[in-house]
């Protein structure tokens, strides 16, 4: 029987941030990945601000540059060290999606793979000698893009940092979108509720995917998320955009393309009718007191 490889404890958040930012500064975004993000509705400016970067074909030059800067990869999920040399636990083609905590620190990264059944996975080195396991974390986005969570703004909750970023940008950057890794991340959601309560948030909008209509497991998981929020005095309301579009990002992308119109579209002229939606109107959730 194969023995389990020793796994290191993760560095403190501020040290993870230092390493991840140093790594991302050495990487670039391939044209095909930039085009993928632009098709999702993001501008070049927004893509650059959120530090999306492509997986390098070779890590050797990255590690050589960072070694000169004294960067250590011990205790950093996604990396491991063997015989004094650093290695990345993944080399499949894709791009990195940084996860930012409430203090604007990068504390983890997901990879969006170009191919495969599972397109999104945590960048983790669990299972490697002196590797480090990635834990489920919530992403709050970066201040230059995502409004700060506090009691004065309506907070939305969805799954996936990329989806949250797109929804925030395409809806006008008016409200913060927090991203869980998935609807089953109950411990992660409880930690998030502790934070939300501490900054005066008492109500959040559930912007999880519309597949709840056909998936009982998703519905049951959402019920548990609602129950956890209630324990912290936080109520939740569903943002219901129907089932034509699976994710809130898909919905807002359709809005930006004119495939569906938001309600209360002003008339261009006094005697001109407001444009008719291709699909039914989906109401905004009003901000609660």
Q: Model-found features: residue ranges?
A:
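Phosphate-handling DNA/RNA-contact segment within nucleic-acid enzymes
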Residues: 3-12, 16, 58-199
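Generic alpha-helical secondary structure signal
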Residues: 14, 18, 31-35, 45, ...
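Conserved short loop/turn motifs at secondary-structure junctions
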Residues: 21-25, 51-55, 213
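Conserved active-site segments centered on acidic
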Residues: 1-36
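TOPRIM fold recognition
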Residues: 119, 149-155, 161-289
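Generic secondary-structure boundary/loop-capping signal
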Residues: 21-24, 39, 44, 49, ...
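Short, small/acidic-rich helices and loops at N termini and domain boundaries
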Residues: 1, 28-95, 250-286
